[in-house]
Amino acid sequence: MNDHSVNDHSVNDHSVNDHSVNDHGVNDYDDTRAGRARVSDTPELKAYYEELGALQAGALWTVANEIEPWYPQPKSVPTLWRYQELRPLVHKALPLVRADDAGRRVVMLVNPGRKELSAAVGLLYTGLQIMGPGEAMTAHRHQAAALRFVQEGTGAWTVVDGQKLKVGPRDFAITPNGTWHEHGNESTEAPVIWQDGLDIPLVNALDAGFYEVHPELYQRPGAVVNSSVLSYGGNLLPHGMEKWTRPYSPLLAWPWEPSYQALLDLAKAAEGSPYDGVIMEYTNPVTGGSVMPTMGAHLQLLRAGQATRAHRHTGSVVYTVAKGRGRSVIAGQRFDWQQGDIFCVPSWAWHEHANLDEREDAVLFSFNDFPVMRSLAFHREEAYPDHDGHQPVAHPIAQPVAHPVTQPAAHPIAQPAEER
């Protein structure tokens, strides 16, 4: 059902000029060098460690190299979930589970390296939610922020803090943290499937999770549908309204058609990024920043036949194929994809994309934790230095072997390449 990269040093070691030996002939990543913890065990030290352990204490030097690695060592592995394989199982949940009993009828996508967190990659969660014809879910709110990307169906709606939004295929919508929200499907003919993205693993890692059920079970939506789109969707800031001061975007939904057209227009005006093609970020129209404090989202276009160069960055990314077909090479593993497929790139993993269609463009939607990385000054990015910017591929097609990938070493203090 899904493909994973393998825990094989050959995937990584040959795919990067790691510059591990510096100009002075010293291995930059040698844990036996001065400046790293290199204390050898002795009987006296072992006895000392036991004394410390009895007091719920320990010696930092025994774990220092592990908890302060030379470079990021994500537990997540590059993974591809094929939509056409998952879709029948998502539909199968309709008669098996009542939505009111489940809270949300969602098939979550779990990274084999992050099962304990129910995460898709890093500290990001994603899943496929299905709503049958005429269904309406009860309202709740939680500390986690959420976003939606519609895979299929024309009747989807959501109510966010009293504002009703109608969304269709490939539309993007947000449910900021702490907002009351409920969802439904007003179609009488077909189900709706949309992709959820949340920062639940991050919230739980910080022990900050809260959850509430709406006291009336359902909200009372305002009279104007899609009012945020009508107010903020025209690339102009409205006057005569209450000043927006909340830490997330007042625009809550981005329809597919104008978003795709914006990519086409940008493709006429600019060459784009060598690493991401023609790429744009969904933004808060008031600040110009990311749509929410903990998650950002992008839409990118790969021209017909285009192959990007490889780069890597701190921060995890979940990609969804909105249009077309192609392939991505992630940490030396090739993943072929088509519309609807979902794949992930762990933090600090080399990755590049290619459009396999010589006549039509391909479009990728993605969401990430870049706002967190940037707000904490953790963001770093670098270009792949060898082979004209392309990784050697260890295997033609990634095979389903569920083991973590050891990330390759490179510059420990990398300067940002072109900002994404």
Residue map of PLM features:
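Contiguous mid-protein beta-loop-alpha structural module that forms a pocket-lining wall or clamp
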Residues: 177-231
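Short amphipathic alpha-helical linker/capping segments at the junctions of internal repeats
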Residues: 172, 214-219, 334-343, 352, ...
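A short, N-terminal "cap"/entry segment at the start of jelly-roll beta-barrel domains
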Residues: 2-3, 27-122, 219-294, 298, ...
